[in-house]
A protein has these predicted regions:
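C-terminal flanking helix
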Residues: 2, 23, 97, 101, ...
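Short, charged helix-capping/linker segments at alpha-helix termini
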Residues: 2-21, 125, 148-150
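Sigma70-family region 2
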Residues: 7-10, 21-38, 57-59
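Arg/Lys-rich amphipathic alpha helix in sigma70-family domain 2
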Residues: 31-35, 45-65, 82, 134
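C-terminal edge and immediately downstream basic/flexible tail or linker adjoining helix-turn-helix-like DNA-binding
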Residues: 119-122, 136-160
Length: 160
């Protein structure tokens, strides 16, 4: 569950704080688990909600509310992704603006719908879609830049 919290945090310490807050909530709500679905899924949802609440409380989370039409963004080259270490991908995700990163995590990784994300974050469904589209676009540009300049390959060679 630390990995779940870390996707929303800016540092390991912040992720640990989120996780600790989440486990406190889990223990407080343990008697409400109804055995309808997996226990792990229930815990994961509490950790995600705790992380979002933590972000709102401590980082004054702000989202762009500008609504744009979603447009097709071609997928990044699989060669660029394959040549990168997990650490580099995690760093690219952490370098995204907080709003983009949060929506990307909730939609692409946690599997929430844009409607659910809008409700969770207090934004319009269309804003969630826009944030997700922008996050994908920014990640694609950064992946292409890494591939173009060979940064991933150079870093890979220096780790061998």
């Amino acid at each position: 569950m630390l990995g779940v919290a870390f996707r929303y945090a800016n540092s390991r310490e912040e992720a640990e704080d989120m996780l600790q807050e989440g486990f406190i909530r889990i223990f407080q709500k343990l008697n409400t688990f109804r055995f309808q679905g997996s226990f792990e899924g229930w815990i994961r949802r509490i950790i995600v909600n705790t992380a979002i609440n933590h972000i709102r409380k401590y980082q004054n989370l702000k989202y762009e509310c500008e609504i744009e039409e979603a447009y097709y963004i071609p997928a990044a080259s699989s060669d660029a992704i394959a040549s990168m270490y997990t650490r580099e991908v995690i760093q690219l995700l952490h370098d995204l603006p907080l709003g983009y990163r949060t929506v990307l995590n909730l939609y692409a990784i946690e599997g929430y719908s844009h409607r659910e994300i809008g409700e969770m974050l207090g934004i319009e469904e269309s804003s969630s879609r826009s944030q997700y589209t922008r996050a994908k676009s920014l990640l694609q540009k950064r992946l292409q830049k890494l591939e173009e300049y060979g940064i991933a390959e150079n870093d890979k060679a220096s780790h061998q």
